[in-house]
């Protein structure tokens, strides 16, 4: 039974992964563009925030973004293979030492900043 479920999940991932999914980790700043369906119809909305956690679980993979707007912390959990997602873009690579940044939930202002990670492999001569 588990093999059947595994095959089904792999088929669904192939169907839903028609867009480019960049490599990112927690601490990276992401810009997610998604379709929002409401009573007026369909519109496109972008959400830019720091990735607090990433959960890799096949078809049910997800990540949580956090941003501060008007002194209020806003969190958004996004499923990686959701059909409502238009694009995922990495704005900045963060340098952190943990996989889950739950300590960031209580931080605001300058204390919530994350250092930028410099990729040494793409160093120009």
Swiss-Prot record:
Pfam family, one: Ribosomal_L19
Keywords: Ribonucleoprotein, Ribosomal protein
GO biological process: translation
Gene3D superfamilies with a match to the protein in the record: 2.30.30.790
Function recorded in the entry: This protein is located at the 30S-50S ribosomal subunit interface and may play a role in the structure and function of the aminoacyl-tRNA binding site.
Similarity comment: family membership: Belongs to the bacterial ribosomal protein bL19 family.
Protein name as annotated: Large ribosomal subunit protein bL19
């Amino acid at each position: 039974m588990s093999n059947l479920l595994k095959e089904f999940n792999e088929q669904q991932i192939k169907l839903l992964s028609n867009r480019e999914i960049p490599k990112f980790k927690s601490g990276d700043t992401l810009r997610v563009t998604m379709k929002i369906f409401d009573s007026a119809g369909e519109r496109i909305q972008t959400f830019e925030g720091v990735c607090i956690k990433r959960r890799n679980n096949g078809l049910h993979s997800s990540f949580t973004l956090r941003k501060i707007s008007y002194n209020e912390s806003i969190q958004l959990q996004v499923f990686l293979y959701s059909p409502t997602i238009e694009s995922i873009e990495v704005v900045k690579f963060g340098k952190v030492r943990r996989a889950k940044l739950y300590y960031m939930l209580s931080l605001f202002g300058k204390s919530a900043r994350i250092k930028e990670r410099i990729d040494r492999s793409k160093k120009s001569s």
